[in-house]
Amino acid sequence: MFRDFCKERLKRAKAKNKVRDKLACKLLFWKLKDYQNILLYSPLGHELDIRPLIFRLRQKNKRVWLPKSIKKGANFSKEGFTIAPFRLPLKRLGWFDEPSLSRCYKRELDCIVVPILGMDTSFRRVGFGLGMYDRSLPKLLKKQLKRPLIVFVSRELAIANSILTNAYDIEANLYMNARIVMKNDKRKHYEQRVNLHFIRSFGSVFDHRSSHVLCDEKDLLR
């Protein structure tokens, strides 16, 4: 299964590559700096570490939201989440924790950044199979007049060569990591661009059979 392949790939990946994560955060910042209400996530060990991005956006007075588990009795539900504003200190589980709920008015989200295992050719998310984002986002966005920008992120890109997802699975506008940005263009399937800053930093060699377009970071997100 594609999901199992992605999980095995995660186990083999170098989870401590801080340089790549910082490059990805820098690229994400260029995209998100014009948005005001942004839903991010609390990164797990296998996910792209976006903590530097969260703090940088807060320094720019952006309203950052994080998922907040819904408590059912003595336990937390695995079926969905609500959102809460990012605030310091976050001490319950150590250095980085879920935010606490507040009466802060939930404004309409402008942008949502979603961690993924992989995606298929319809630009829909393949996650861990719990369906938390698929259940939660429609409820959060139900009363919004405008659909927010949805950005998929991961350390390494994995794309299935066929459609594996369902119509209710999340579809993104963009995919981003330290190396590339892919735009979901329904007319041309997708466009892909390579981050020149990454090439300069790592001296990487790419497969040009996929018609990569080389460009600098500021031009990458046009």
Which residues make up each language-model segment?
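Glycine-rich, N-terminal phosphate-binding loop of Rossmann-like dinucleotide-binding domains
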Residues: S42, I116, R179
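Charged helix-capping and loop-helix junction motifs
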Residues: F55, F128-D134
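Short glycine-rich anion-binding loops that position phosphate/pyrophosphate groups of nucleotides
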Residues: L44-H46, L117-T121
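Residue-level signal for inorganic ion chemistry
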Residues: C6, V64, V113, G129, ...
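N-terminal active-site beta-alpha-beta segment that forms phosphate/nucleotide-binding
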Residues: M1-R103, R107
